[in-house]
Amino acid sequence: MPTINIYKWRLLNELKISETQLEDLLFNLKSEMKPIDQDHIEIEINNDRPDLLFVYGIIRSIKGLLKKELGEPRYSVKDTDYVFEIKEVPSRPYALAAVVEDIKFDDELLKELIQFQEKLHITVGRKRKKIAIGLHDLKKIDSKHIIYTTVNLDYKFIPLNSDKEMSVREILESTPQGKEYGNISLLDGKMPAIMQDDGQILSLPPVINSEKTRINSKTQSLFIDVTGTSLDTVIFTLDVIVTNLAEMGGKIGRIKVISPYVDNSPLLQHKSIKITAEYINKILGTNLNKNEIIEYLKMARFDVNDLGKEIEVIIPPYRNDILSQIDITEEVAITYGYNNLSPTPYKIEKIGSLSDRTKLIRVLRDLSVGGGFTEIFTFTLISESLLLGDFVKILNPITVDYNSVRNSLLPSILIFLSKNQHARMPIRVFEIGDVVIRNENTETGYSNKLNAAYAIMNSRVSFEELQAPLHEILNSLGINPIYKRDTNPLFIEGRTASIYANNKKIGIIGEINPNILEKIDIEYPIVMSEIYLDEIKDIL
């Protein structure tokens, strides 16, 4: 987890608390501190709280715990004359900016601001690959029209910590920042650049700023730019920075943005989550009334609307860790106090045993191996191009080959078979594993289901070659299956059946459609079946 070094007296004086109290309060924020020297402490911050990577973010949260301030802070935001024009930058397409004025720095606070910038680079920014931040002295910018564009490698400016003009190529090849970050956004001999409308470069993201706009302890106004590959992350990062600076008295300035995605920035976006007192009390084992819960949520620095049966919680723009009702419940637990949650003695009156689910898996595994099948284990993630129906898609996949969560075991097994066509035929395999399917009755709208799947691949194979051993396996479980003709785009029409038991559908079986096989470059015919083990468990 990230750590920050801060001047402890700022915290203690602002909050008017002792060092021991500070340690206890930080623990409530899932953070820990240890002394560095007489004036400084190191604080370990939880990964999901980038808003606490700056001293004033910590002060904001602790003021809530101490009830010195309740609800979301109100920040002064005014429109400015600055314009930020976004050109096409293929390697790093998103950029936003803001102005913060009336800031008072000292040497310690300036160090902590630069530390905040670098910690955001490492955590949220994934070492500047996802986002990069530029901090500029606003008074040193000569124009109110700033442009985000690309420049070629011969373009020159004076980089930070230098007194001579250098070309972009020289900066990438000779400076420490250029060597470490230069290749991140270099594309076709061009680099992203933020410049004045007269062509003077202010920043070369994600590498280095210009010496022209260097900040120091006398800086009173900042121009902040954030560039990146994810618009949502760029928006959030800028919101986190400006709200932290506003906590130290800064006035946020809104900038007009010329871009295809936003008209101005910062956006300071809010979202809301509705929750009930019953839900919170059920999770925490408490008996808090609605008014008490509202008070605890305000201590967590949330605004709250009483909707009668429900409570609407307004999530501040700097809290991207609040995703669902369970996160709201955790915030109530923090402000209520974990030490105030009474543990309930749990009496175990019988010895442990295997669950029905585990027993079924073990028996089915033995029967399947006895039926001549080899067990395989495939990835839960798969390409969306191989899935049918409703499925969960990953927001930030590393690769398109694993951008979705499977809703069936069959596509995963087909991928396995496509990579093993060189093996000796026939190939008879099975897999027992979880799939994720649509379920409107759950909080997320999806739920896990346990399935088993079987496949036979050979130079010649038929429906009956799998039906016979599968029938024996199901019979051995105490299931008397009935097969009814059905259709499914994965299988050949007329060679497909749904499997029923006790008037409940428990699976499907069929010969794979040749068009599907051709799509994934399989040269052999395949017959497959998928069994819904949760349905079987209910029958047994």
From Swiss-Prot:
GO annotation, cellular component aspect: phenylalanine-tRNA ligase complex
Domain B5: 268-343
Alphabetical list of CDD domains matching this protein: PheRS_beta_core
TM stretches of this protein: none
Cofactor or coenzyme needed: Mg(2+)
InterPro entries in alphabetical order: aa-tRNA-synth_II/BPL/LPL (IPR045864), B3/B4_tRNA-bd (IPR005146), DNA-bd_dom_put_sf (IPR009061), Phe-tRNA-ligase_IIc_bsu (IPR045060), Phe-tRNA-synth_IIc_bsu_arc_euk (IPR004531), Phe-tRNA_synthase-like_B3/B4 (IPR020825), Phe_tRNA_ligase_beta2_arc (IPR022918), PheRS_beta_core (IPR041616)
GO molecular function: ATP binding; magnesium ion binding; phenylalanine-tRNA ligase activity; RNA binding
Record-listed Mg(2+) binding positions: 321, 327, 330-331
Alphabetized UniProt keyword annotations: Aminoacyl-tRNA synthetase, ATP-binding, Cytoplasm, Ligase, Magnesium, Metal-binding, Nucleotide-binding, Protein biosynthesis
Highest taxon, organism lineage: Archaea
Localization (cell): Cytoplasm
Gene3D superfamilies hit by this protein: 3.30.56.10, Bira Bifunctional Protein, Domain 2, Phenylalanyl-trna Synthetase, Chain B, domain 3
Cysteine disulfide partners in this protein: none
Keyword Nucleotide-binding among record annotations: yes
Catalytic activity field: tRNA(Phe) + L-phenylalanine + ATP = L-phenylalanyl-tRNA(Phe) + AMP + diphosphate + H(+)
Main location group: cytoplasm
Record-listed E.C. numbers: 6.1.1.20
GO biological process: phenylalanyl-tRNA aminoacylation
Quaternary structure and partners: Tetramer of two alpha and two beta subunits.
NCBIfam families cross-referenced by the UniProt entry: pheT_arch (TIGR00471)
Family named by the database record: Belongs to the phenylalanyl-tRNA synthetase beta subunit family. Type 2 subfamily.
The protein's name: Phenylalanine--tRNA ligase beta subunit
Gene name of the encoded protein: pheT
